[in-house]
Amino acid sequence: MKKTLLAASAVVALSASFTAGAAETEKPQYLSDWWHQSVNVVGSYHTRFGPQIRNDTYLEYEAFAKKDWFDFYGYIDAPVFFGGNSTAKGIWNKGSPLFMEIEPRFSIDKLTNTDLSFGPFKEWYFANNYIYDMGRNDSQEQSTWYMGLGTDIDTGLPMSLSLNIYAKYQWQNYGASNENEWDGYRFKVKYFVPLTDLWGGSLSYIGFTNFDWGSDLGDDNFYDMNGKHARTSNSIASSHILALNYAHWHYSIVARYFHNGGQWADDAKLNFGDGDFSVRSTGWGGYFVVGYNF
């Protein structure tokens, strides 16, 4: 989920395993030769997308594809499927039963049959990032659409790099004041670096960072117990992944840095009816992922 957001960076890492698998045998090993998918078990620790730190273990379906003009990454999560801490609500304990994020990009070069490359910019896309949290009531629902321009960069190095810049339209946002309006921008950086062969698999380093700014949330009238703004107009989430990929199995360790995670002000003093607490929206969290490609 957004709470994991291995997101599109995992696309490139998984592609290495599919390529390796294809070389091993001419028999098809996967259900599709272009729609690549996996089922994952994800354990998260100290994620900071809400006002309270969250730990949980959940089930995830993940898919990516790149065919002609279509570039896709997406996942669907069943939150807290295998349990979590007291603040983690999900499918079995009256929380959201489903969280989804998709990142479709459509090649402008290929759709217009025009070579728009120049300098290090290889290809241009109409880029999208849509996030949906089903929830069970208004306080658990999110629907956010980022839309804008994306590009792939030729670095001249054995790595891949892509950049996307978006404007954001916010529908539901857990009851926040910025619902049903245009509200800010996002700049996304994603990169992939193959490292080495290890234990019969392929070890890679993957990174992606979301820079969010320009939101109205930091100016609303939601104040903490000390009279300070409880929300912010900006946030950063920066993920750093070591991924070990095989033909079918893959394993990842993720370190993620949050700054104003979920646009919550760090150290804000709040009380939602279960006692006072301090928001810890800035700091490190982590994930461990085990998945099967099919």
From Swiss-Prot:
Swiss-Prot/TrEMBL keywords: Cell outer membrane, Ion transport, Membrane, Porin, Signal, Transmembrane, Transmembrane beta strand, Transport
Signal peptide boundaries: 1-22
Keyword Ligase listed? The answer is: no
What does the entry list under GO cellular component?
Answer: cell outer membrane; pore complex
Q: Which Gene Ontology molecular function entries are recorded, alphabetically? A: nucleoside transmembrane transporter activity; porin activity
Annotated membrane topology: Multi-pass membrane protein
Task: Tell me the Gene Ontology biological-process terms attached to this UniProt entry.
Answer: monoatomic ion transport
**Keyword Signal attributed:** yes
Quote the protein name from its UniProt record.
Nucleoside-specific channel-forming protein Tsx
Provide the species name.
Answer: Klebsiella aerogenes (strain ATCC 13048 / DSM 30053 / CCUG 1429 / JCM 1235 / KCTC 2190 / NBRC 13534 / NCIMB 10102 / NCTC 10006 / CDC 819-56) (Enterobacter aerogenes)
What is the taxonomic lineage of the source species? Bacteria, Pseudomonadati, Pseudomonadota, Gammaproteobacteria, Enterobacterales
Q: State the encoding gene.
A: tsx
